[in-house]
UniProtKB/Swiss-Prot annotation:
Transmembrane stretches, start-end: 14-34, 51-71, 86-106, 121-141
Keywords in alphabetical order: Cell membrane, Membrane, Transmembrane, Transmembrane helix
Name this protein carries in UniProt: UPF0756 membrane protein YeaL
Natural source organism: Salmonella paratyphi B (strain ATCC BAA-1250 / SPB7)
Localization: Cell membrane
Keyword Cell cycle: no
UniProt similarity note: Belongs to the UPF0756 family.
Name of the gene encoding the protein in the UniProt record: yeaL
GO cellular component terms, semicolon-separated: plasma membrane
């Protein structure tokens, strides 16, 4: 039997490899493996908890330099007195807020996820962009279309 969803996933994985977006490509290949094996019974859990688990792993990666001591406390304290660091803090707050809006939008309008993913891959492939991820893109979309 012909599986259109599998074909779409393979196409997106190919776009990921072509655009040197290995994060997208590997993620899609893992989902393909889950889809074509008995692991497919885990899809309800992945759909419900996957984003939360991913954000936890991302947060661990971001906080690791603080926890390991690579980023000393003096550097953290200094970030509150340097104007460039204050701008970075403000931008970080704004981007985090956008990501929150993005999660809401993706949960309420899941049909936009494919468009966000394709747009991210095309941006990397055609404009030498960086795959910053669909959460921020979804947050920006939510500013235009609303987050309902």
């Amino acid at each position: 039997m012909f599986d259109v969803t599998l074909l779409i996933l393979l196409g997106l994985a190919a776009l990921g490899f072509i655009s040197h977006n290995t994060t997208v490509a590997v993620s899609i290949l893992v989902l393909i493996i889950v889809r074509v094996t008995p692991l497919n019974t885990f899809f309800p859990w992945i759909e419900k908890q996957g984003l939360t688990v991913g954000i936890i792993i991302l947060t661990i990666g971001v906080m690791a330099p603080i926890a390991s001591g690579t980023l000393p406390p003096s550097t953290l304290i200094h970030s509150f007195v340097n104007w460039k660091s204050l701008v970075a803090i403000a931008v970080g707050v704004f981007v985090s807020w956008l990501g929150g809006r993005g999660i809401t939008l993706m949960g309420n309008q899941p049909q936009l996820v494919a468009g966000l993913l394709v747009g991210t891959v095309l941006g990397v492939a055609l404009f030498r962009g960086v795959p910053v991820g669909p959460l921020i893109a979804a947050g920006l979309v939510s500013l235009i279309v609303g987050k309902q």
